[in-house]
């Protein structure tokens, strides 16, 4: 939203920003919900995938479209992106780590940081599934407490480091550990629905 004409209108800017936050939160919640149902369905058929099989399936599902999207974006970008510094950004996007640094976050596309977080969630999703399946309520509570602690620790560290740039806070509050509650709450909602629906 930076530099846009509506930025000077506080009410409009706040609504647009809030809408974006709500959209991202729903995206993560639905991702957790969908992953839980997918794994639960596989387990019901007696073929719950191991970590490698799960990641292989996820990669096949998201990587082709994701890489095509990045490649198309790069075709229309400045040739500076193909410098030594630019290659750092390209590598970060192709390895789903663009959200790790304020330098690469949003450098090719401002929305694709969510794919980095989603991919990192996939890396731990099979383990979270087992915890949520065992006790969805405890898992949800623990995830909320963990996320609050992580967010507080990040803000405190950045503040003590003398960093006042809001964009840096924006980036480091959008990591998988600071969005974990969204994913787990989505999984917990699916677990609750499955348990009540099976009665």
What kind of region is each of these model predictions?
Residues 7-16, 164-171:
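Membrane-interface segments at the starts/ends of alpha-helical transmembrane spans
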Residues 2-8, 158-162:
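Short, positively charged
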Residues 28, 47-50, 88-113, 127-199:
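Aromatic-enriched alpha-helical transmembrane segments of multi-pass intramembrane proteins
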Residues 1, 62, 74-78, 97, ...:
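Phosphate/oxyanion-binding loops and surfaces in catalytic or ligand/nucleic-acid-binding neighborhoods
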Residues 34-35:
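Short beta-strand segments in beta-sandwich/barrel cores
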Residues 72-81, 149-157:
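C-terminal TM-helix exit segments that contain a strictly Trp-centered aromatic cap at the helix terminus
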Residues 17-28, 38-77, 84-96, 119-122, ...:
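Transmembrane alpha-helical segments and their boundary/interface "anchor" motifs
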